[in-house]
From Swiss-Prot:
Listed GO MF terms: mechanosensitive monoatomic ion channel activity
Topology in membrane: Multi-pass membrane protein
Keyword Protein biosynthesis attributed: no
Membrane-traversing stretches: 10-30, 76-96
Protein name: Large-conductance mechanosensitive channel
Organism per entry: Yersinia pestis
Cellular compartment(s): Cell inner membrane
Length: 137
């Protein structure tokens, strides 16, 4: 089998395509959450805390010298990233919890059908029936 044909079969499998779609949707969702945190949640929170812009929170490790920029530790941006993570984690947790609930409800609605008897079980039942028939004669 040629390398390209093998790769094409791998790439077109259902689970690989599903994974690619999930990654793309996840990236878009991440941008939406980042905007929600940066543009909607953090400004009112900063206002409640006295007009603070979290993006401006930083420690200067080394001041700027001429054309050399300052070295800073942006902990305000880190705080925003923590809010992003918490919101994404909460959304994913909620989605998984909902999916699990729907699966449980579906499983409860559909009673499990008993498995079909194996050939061994069918043969044993036939032997039992033959033995019963011989004893009743």
């Amino acid at each position: 089998m040629s390398f390209m044909k093998e790769f094409r079969e791998f790439a077109m499998r259902g689970n690989v395509v599903d994974l690619a779609v999930g990654v793309i949707i996840g990236a878009a969702f991440g941008r939406i959450v980042s905007s929600l945190v940066a543009d909607i949640i953090m400004p009112p929170l900063g206002l409640l805390l006295g007009g603070v812009d979290f993006k401006q929170f930083h420690f200067v490790l080394r001041a700027a010298e001429g054309t050399i920029p300052a070295v800073v530790m942006n902990y305000g941006t880190f705080i925003q990233s923590i809010f992003d993570f918490v919101i994404v984690a909460l959304a994913i947790f909620s989605a998984v919890k909902l999916m699990n609930k729907l699966r449980r409800e579906k499983a409860e609605e559909e009673p499990a059908t008993p498995p079909a008897p194996t050939t061994e079980e069918i043969l044993l039942a036939e032997i039992r029936d033959l033995l019963k028939a011989q004893h009743t004669k």
